[in-house]
């Protein structure tokens, strides 16, 4: 299986995705740093940070922007690796190999999932680390509500990253059903609106039950994406 995953990375030129992730992560890090220490979120009259409900601490902003960016980025990769292959018929050639269709499709999904999970975790660690380092020299506009010396911090970071990247399988299912890369990407934006919305002072992102529900739904949609691929007509 890992050989197939490596083949997918090589075939789709994973280097360009690494470059794009590095640029995206750097931009998010700079934005969060400016948000925290350069006062770009402060009210010009009062000097008080004007944050959205549920985002009064810096970790909420970090999770919000990294989740949005990587949910869309993962969906874009899935649309390139899988949905576009269905659309332009190159999947026909791949399915002519003496390998089960399900195994090929799973390897493509895992290639995207592993890449984005690792990238998301590293991006979060970079941002949290930079914000913590900045606190040694500057005063933050937002409370630093995390402790990088705590094991709980890393467990929570990993779990949230798993949920976000896995959610992209919902967008993949929609894109495959419609045979449309655009549908995959648009679905990822809709997922962002649904999961990161604020209702009054209540933030859906902070709901303890929501990640579990999303994880179960994502796995169901991932299963549905590969369930009947052995007999599915590609035309």
Task: Mark where each language-model region is.
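Helix-loop-helix units of permease transmembrane domains in multi-pass membrane transporters
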Residues: 81-113
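Transmembrane alpha-helical segments in integral membrane proteins
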Residues: 70-87, 162-183, 221
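Aromatic- and glycine-rich beta-strand/loop motifs that create alpha-glucan
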Residues: 1-25
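Membrane-interface helix caps and helix-loop-helix hairpins in membrane proteins
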Residues: 200-208
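Hydrophobic alpha-helical transmembrane segments of multi-pass membrane transport/permease proteins
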Residues: 16-41, 61-77, 118, 184-199, ...
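Membrane-helix interface segments
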Residues: 17-18, 100-101, 105-106, 180-185, ...
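Secretory targeting signals
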Residues: 29-76, 107-172
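Membrane-interface capping segments at transmembrane-helix boundaries
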Residues: 226-235
